[in-house]
């Protein structure tokens, strides 16, 4: 059984007298910065000139500097920028300000795992990755709770990188819920696979195909939307709360029987083989190479696909139906 670590396992005092620079002030950035600040840490924010987030960070009581200035002042640098921007910002603004004894950290291992960022040997390189969106990380912390997190050490120059990573996880509230140790390779590959095969790619295509099947068979698009998209959350909430078994305990016998006899007709050995191919593309760097090349070209394919998907009938139907639900407004 994988070991989880909690508040008593981490020493927050290891962060005392360290200036922590949060690079980026988006969903995760604001949560990390404010949680660390409320934990008594010295936190500054690094943003590019003219960033729309500067005013928000200042109003939240944080000192804002350019990325270069923040990294020069900091003992600990947490990069919370989108994956595709990290390499360029690192080379221009962060790397020139790295000195022996500094800690370089990430919330996702993409750029380290695929060699886009290659830190010098004289810094610690760690990861602290909350398993929830930034607003949840902040909300749970403010309510005396926390969001579970992963932590990992890629490079231990100081000999104390593991304890430092655990201390940071405690500072953002992770050890209140429990933190799990991993490595950059495992975190990156499982995260990308989950997004592509199940959570985003797999689920999106499943929902669209179900919707299309019903509409093409002559059923009302609104009913198809309810059955194939709207009710996904109801089932997923049951799964998250108690696993597949509790979900099946909560649905009708008709639905449960249909689950068992029809599910494997759809998700079968052929589907699993495609999943294995997706995983292989992630493991051997094919996906990362393609994504980097796409970003270098200013995302033409991604922009095209985004536009095409936004015009799908399910989007038009959903826009009208969502106005019915007061809790979504």
From Swiss-Prot:
Mg(2+) 2 binds at residues 191, 227, 231. GO terms for biological process: isoleucine biosynthetic process; L-valine biosynthetic process. Residues 183-328 form the KARI C-terminal knotted domain. It catalyses: (2R)-2,3-dihydroxy-3-methylbutanoate + NADP(+) = (2S)-2-acetolactate + NADPH + H(+); (2R,3R)-2,3-dihydroxy-3-methylpentanoate + NADP(+) = (S)-2-ethyl-2-hydroxy-3-oxobutanoate + NADPH + H(+). Its cofactor is Mg(2+). Its EC number is 1.1.1.86. Pathway: Amino-acid biosynthesis; L-isoleucine biosynthesis; L-isoleucine from 2-oxobutanoate: step 2/4; Amino-acid biosynthesis; L-valine biosynthesis; L-valine from pyruvate: step 2/4. The keyword Magnesium applies. The keyword Amino-acid biosynthesis applies. It comes from the Bacteria. Substrate binds at residue 252. Binds 2 magnesium ions per subunit. Residues 2-182 form the KARI N-terminal Rossmann domain. SUPFAM superfamilies: 6-phosphogluconate dehydrogenase C-terminal domain-like (SSF48179), NAD(P)-binding Rossmann-fold domains (SSF51735). It holds the Pfam family KARI_N. Mg(2+) 1 binds at residues 191, 195. The active site is at 108. Keywords: Amino-acid biosynthesis, Branched-chain amino acid biosynthesis, Magnesium, Metal-binding, NADP, Oxidoreductase. NCBIfam families: ilvC (TIGR00465), PRK05479.1 (NF004017), PRK13403.1 (NF009940). Involved in the biosynthesis of branched-chain amino acids (BCAA). Catalyzes an alkyl-migration followed by a ketol-acid reduction of (S)-2-acetolactate (S2AL) to yield (R)-2,3-dihydroxy-isovalerate. In the isomerase reaction, S2AL is rearranged via a Mg-dependent methyl migration to produce 3-hydroxy-3-methyl-2-ketobutyrate (HMKB). In the reductase reaction, this 2-ketoacid undergoes a metal-dependent reduction by NADPH to yield (R)-2,3-dihydroxy-isovalerate. Belongs to the ketol-acid reductoisomerase family. This is Ketol-acid reductoisomerase (NADP(+)). It comes from Prochlorococcus marinus (strain MIT 9312). The gene is ilvC.
